[in-house]
């Protein structure tokens, strides 16, 4: 605003632009849901986990940490 009088008058105005209430923030992040935004482990997840453990066990022959692992 180039008009300094209008700019000064606007400074005193109570305008809520840009303000977000706590309820709105919770709604944005899923904080007011009964169940949070998570992904459960599915049947295909267990296949990947089992394969990862098997490959890891085959590469590291002992349970102790060594320079090979």
UniProtKB/Swiss-Prot annotation:
Cross-link (Beta-methyllanthionine (Thr-Cys)): 62-65, 66-69
Localization annotation: Secreted, Cell wall
Lanthionine (Ser-Cys) crosslink residues: 44-48, 56-60
PTM annotation, UniProt: Maturation of lantibiotics involves the enzymatic conversion of Thr, and Ser into dehydrated AA and the formation of thioether bonds with cysteine. This is followed by membrane translocation and cleavage of the modified precursor.
Cellular component GO terms held in the UniProt record: extracellular region; Gram-positive-bacterium-type cell wall
Domain of life: Bacteria
Modified residues (2-oxobutanoic acid): 38
Keyword Secreted among record annotations: yes
PTM sites of type 2,3-didehydroalanine (Ser): 45
GO MF annotation terms: signaling receptor binding
Pfam families: Mersacidin
Residues spanning the signal sequence: none
Record PTM (Z)-2,3-didehydrobutyrine, positions in chain: 39, 42-43, 50, 54, 63
Keywords: Antibiotic, Antimicrobial, Bacteriocin, Cell wall, Lantibiotic, Secreted, Thioether bond
Keyword field contains Secreted: yes
One of the GO BP terms on file: defense response to Gram-positive bacterium
Family annotation (InterPro entries): Lant_2_A2
Propeptide: 1-37
Function: Lanthionine-containing peptide antibiotic (lantibiotic) active on Gram-positive bacteria. The bactericidal activity of lantibiotics is based on depolarization of energized bacterial cytoplasmic membranes, initiated by the formation of aqueous transmembrane pores. When present individually, LchA2 exhibits activity towards L.lactis HP.
Protein name (record): Lantibiotic lichenicidin A2
Organism: Bacillus licheniformis (strain ATCC 14580 / DSM 13 / JCM 2505 / CCUG 7422 / NBRC 12200 / NCIMB 9375 / NCTC 10341 / NRRL NRS-1264 / Gibson 46)
Lineage start: Bacteria, Bacillati, Bacillota, Bacilli, Bacillales
């Amino acid at each position: 605003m180039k008009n300094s009088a209008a700019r000064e008058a606007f400074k005193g105005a109570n305008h809520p632009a840009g303000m977000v209430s706590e309820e709105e923030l919770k709604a944005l992040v899923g904080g007011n849901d009964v169940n949070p935004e998570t992904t459960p482990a599915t049947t295909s997840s267990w296949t990947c986990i089992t394969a990862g453990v098997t490959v890891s066990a085959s590469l590291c022959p002992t349970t102790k940490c060594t320079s090979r692992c």
